Design a protein with these regions (language model features):
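Intrinsic disorder at enzyme termini
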Residues: 1-16, 34-37, 43-68, 330, ...
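Catalytic alpha/beta active-site cores
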Residues: 1-262, 292-297, 325, 331, ...
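A glycine-rich phosphate-binding loop feature that marks nucleotide/adenosyl-phosphate handling sites
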Residues: 36-44, 170-174, 210-216, 251-260, ...
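Conserved, mostly hydrophobic/aromatic
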Residues: 42, 103, 159, 277, ...
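Mobile "lid/hinge" segments at catalytic clefts and subdomain interfaces of large enzymes
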Residues: 202-239, 315-393
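Short glycine/threonine-rich loop-to-helix capping motif typified by GTGT followed
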Residues: 219-225, 260-272, 301-314, 342-352, ...
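Glycine-rich anion/phosphate-binding loop at the beta-strand->alpha-helix junction
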Residues: 229-232, 256-344, 351-352
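ATP-dependent carboxylate/acyl-activation modules
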Residues: 454-455, 459-528, 541, 590-591, ...
Length: 617
């Protein structure tokens, strides 16, 4: 058989040659400034990767083999989960059975503490096959042991095979402490009780690491991962110190992680997570390497969901679910697109469910095992994320561990700082949400929708906790400040008109008018674009005839010296005058009294707040 190499006539090109060619094409623009992506995650991303960039050992890694970078099993079947806030048992039961009949094979019930009674569980789970459907329960920490006892008793009464029932009891006392400010120093005893109660159900996990709430609060990817690892290690250490074998503890921990819209980095995050967790558990010397597997449930982010242009939320959650599926997680929840402003409708829940079913039955992602394996880019991202997360993890451990950091407010402050950094970037459109701070729907109204309130209303007190007034985790969506701005405009009862006075150079006036329309429409203003005016006088006359509240001069930098001052003087105090751009003659224009300029460096949020104030909104 002839094994002639393809392209043997072409000599190999080195990485240095590629870089030199890029530098040449940049024509003097600094390579590092233009081509290196300086991420917020603590590492840089190169413009290209080659075989020599692959981390050592990854070429021999296999799915289902320690340290499980490529997945916990030699297949990629994940569970499609949907969450139900259980109130009325019959209603929640009907919802669950309808979802199961239409492709969902994992249900998560959120149950208030006051509902934990012997009568409630049979009514909630009536007619649901606990052996074929994964059942997960998020119960108030103060009632979790009682609930678990009642659940096991129910399974026995209904003659389910306890070796086959599968699911989780989401006991996460540190997570509760983080959001409530109530310290729980006695959680180890609860873990011991839960492990004992669920010992008869080997496919149940009773300890949860809910790092998805960090994602929802604005944590960076490496930050969420590092904290999740330290969080899990805290439970692992406490339980083994209490005498529970490491294999038992590790097999009882489930990680509930968030998924941001950073597609490739999220794929890499989950791969890095499995690798690092396997190596952490290995340090405890388990009897079986299978105890080192990190079981991950992935939840699409709420941090980037928006009130306005809410259908775009479907697109966000679709790419997020896709990245988690490619990464090989065990189960996925897609948040319904309307969860920002209402209890999700049946339509929204159906779409959320179908988003995953499309990935399975139409895209066939469940038929491909770790397609990212061997990718120069994703393998390098995996290594970079792992290295940065490990560094942060070790810093937490050296400072006394995760629980100590939570009690002192260190974790909450760090995540809040990250969220604030991201909001600052969002205000300047360095971070973008389509339909909110960029490319808004000009004619959209809220239709009475307002952000849904969040909070614990479990209906009971948390056993083993004490009030400390500790710092709580601030969970705030990225879009909220812009949404409030737009809602304020609506509530004012009038919609300010922003008129584009386009004049001069055709390309520049169109570009600046488009920029200005997008800029001002994010506050809910009515924007009036124009093809162009022959003279300043013509443009000003049209603006005043339109009863414009704001007039934006759109032209080229060179022509502003000619047009801006006459236009400003003609407008006078009849409207707010803005120049679109940052022309060289800015100082001269300011001396003439022009104070409002908008450009790509503007803080969009603060500029719009100032305009609202001037408009009396």
């Amino acid at each position: 058989m002839n094994k002639e190499k393809l392209f043997s006539d072409f000599s190999p090109v080195s990485s240095e040659d590629w870089k030199n060619k890029i530098v040449e094409d940049l024509k003097g623009v600094p390579y590092d400034k233009k081509m290196i992506w300086k991420t917020s995650e603590g590492f840089n991303v190169n413009p290209f990767y080659r075989k020599e960039d692959l981390p050592v050992g990854c070429e021999n890694a296999l799915p289902g083999v320690f340290p499980f970078t490529r997945g916990n099993k030699p297949c990629n079947s994940w569970l499609v989960r949907q969450d139900i806030k259980a109130g009325d048992a019959a209603e929640a039961n009907a919802k669950a059975k309808a979802l199961i009949a239409n492709g969902v094979n994992s249900i998560a019930f959120g149950i208030k503490g006051k509902l934990v009674t012997p009568e409630y569980i049979p009514a909630l789970l009536d007619g649901i096959d606990a052996e074929s459907v994964e059942l997960n329960f998020n119960v108030c920490v103060g009632k979790v042991v009682l609930f678990t006892q009642l659940l096991v008793e129910y399974y026995r009464q209904r003659a389910f095979d306890l070796e086959k029932v599968k699911g989780s009891i989401g006991y996460d006392p540190i997570g509760k402490e983080m959001t409530s400010g109530k310290v729980n120093d006695s959680y180890t005893e609860v873990i011991k009780a839960l492990v004992a109660e669920t010992a008869c159900m080997p496919k149940y996990r009773c300890i949860a690491v809910n790092s998805g709430k960090l994602n929802n609060a604005g944590a960076y990817i490496t930050q969420e991962l590092a904290y999740a690892l330290a969080w899990g290690n805290e439970y692992l250490h406490a339980a083994t110190q209490a005498g529970i074998p490491v294999d038992v503890v590790a097999k009882n921990i489930k990680f509930n992680m968030g998924i941001s819209s950073n597609f490739f980095m999220e794929i890499a995050k989950f791969r890095a997570a499995r690798t690092l967790w396997a190596k952490i558990v290995e340090q405890y010397e388990p009897e079986c390497k299978c105890s080192c597997k990190m079981i991950i449930h992935a939840e699409t982010s709420e941090f980037n969901l928006t009130l306005f242009d809410a259908y775009v939320n479907m697109l966000r959650t679709q790419t997020e679910a896709m990245s988690a599926a490619i990464a090989g997680v065990e189960s996925i929840t897609v948040t319904p697109y309307d969860a920002v402003y209402e209890a999700p409708t049946d339509f929204a829940v159906r779409i959320a469910k179908n988003q995953q079913l499309i990935l399975k039955h139409e895209s066939h992602l469940d038929k491909v095992i770790d397609p990212a394996g061997g990718s120069y880019y994703i393998e390098s991202l995996t290594a970079s994320i792992a290295a940065e997360a490990l560094k942060q993890f070790l810093a937490i451990e050296e400072a006394g561990g995760f629980h100590k950091a939570v009690k002192e407010g260190v974790i909450q402050q760090a995540v809040e700082a990250s969220g604030n950094e991201r909001r600052a970037a969002f205000a300047k459109r360095r971070e973008v949400l389509i339909g909110t701070n960029q490319y808004p729907n000009f004619n959209e109204l809220s239709n009475g929708h307002c952000p849904a309130s969040k909070g614990c209303n479990c209906g009971c007190h948390c056993d083993g906790t004490k009030e400390t007034g500790g710092k709580t985790l601030a969970i705030k969506r990225l879009a909220e400040d812009f949404e409030q701005l737009r809602l304020s405009t609506e509530e004012s009862g009038r919609r300010p008109k922003a008129f584009m006075l386009t004049i001069g150079n055709l390309a520049m006036r169109q570009a600046r008018a488009q920029f200005s329309c997008n800029f001002l429409a994010t506050a809910g203003y009515e924007v009036i674009d124009n093809l162009g005016f022959a003279t300043v006088e013509e443009g000003v006359k049209a603006a005043l005839a339109a009863n414009a509240d704001i007039v934006v001069l759109c032209s080229s930098d060179e022509e502003y010296a000619e047009f801006a001052i006459p236009a400003y003087q003609a407008i006078g105090d009849k409207a707010i005058f803005i120049v679109a751009g940052a022309p060289a003659c800015t100082e001269e224009l300011q001396k003439a009294g022009i104070v409002n300029f908008i450009n790509i460096k503007s803080n969009v949020l603060e500029t719009l707040k100032a305009l609202n104030a001037k408009l009396g909104i």
